[in-house]
Amino acid sequence: MTEPDLSPAFVLHTRPYRETSQLVDLFVASMGKVSVVAKGSRSPRSSVKGLLQPFLPLHIHYGGKSSLKTLLQLEARSPQVALQGERLFSALYLNELLYYLLEPDTEYPGLFSGYFQTLLALADQQQLVSPLLRQFELLLLQQLGYGADFCYAADSCLPIDPACYYRYEPEAGFITTALRDHAFFSGREIIGIAEQAFSDEYILAAARRFSRQAFAALLGNRPLKSRELYSAFIARRSE
């Protein structure tokens, strides 16, 4: 009997199901977001009880013809990525974006490896958190089909001018404007975001502002729990 092919995966979200099982949303390398039922995974003697955790690289096998698959095999392929404090909440933020925005059973080439590399980079205390988040956000937007054109203005098709100002319209792109306030971007900022020149704090702040606008349009009114948890963490630390 041949061994089943195992797919690399990460857990995005779990919730209890019936008495001893779980419903699990997975990020699978070859299939994007996949929802499975892990039968008996909450029972005391379950062999997979401690494996359905976020940030633990997994190999999985699942089956079924409905949108809810059945988890058939699960094993850890390397140790859990060690994350604490701000870095943990940042990784939870990435998981929420993937959970809410990925289409079920849809492959996103390059996104899985980008996610894994971002987790590893977040675990490296020598790397700054904010640039890593901005890089992944840009990758995710591009993979979702909402990547902005940072080279040309949507209204004129002219190259972005460092001396001009633009507003961002999620369905269109950057549109030239004469107004200037916190919601608008200079051409210099847009070019800097395109180049991912995030060692420049001015560009890094603009990239964060851009991501907030872009994801607000996609997430709608859905609140991100990771932001609430991080705010509570900061409040407790400052007491």
UniProtKB/Swiss-Prot annotation:
Keywords noted in UniProt: DNA damage, DNA recombination, DNA repair
Listed Pfam families: RecO_C (PF02565), RecO_N (PF11967)
GO cellular component annotations of the record: bacterial nucleoid
Coiled coil regions in record: none
InterPro entries: ARFGAP/RecO, DNA_rep/recomb_RecO_N, NA-bd_OB-fold, RecO, RecO_C
GO terms for biological process, alphabetical: DNA recombination; double-strand break repair
Task of the protein: Involved in DNA repair and RecF pathway recombination.
Family membership: Belongs to the RecO family.
Name of the protein this chain belongs to: DNA repair protein RecO
Gene: recO
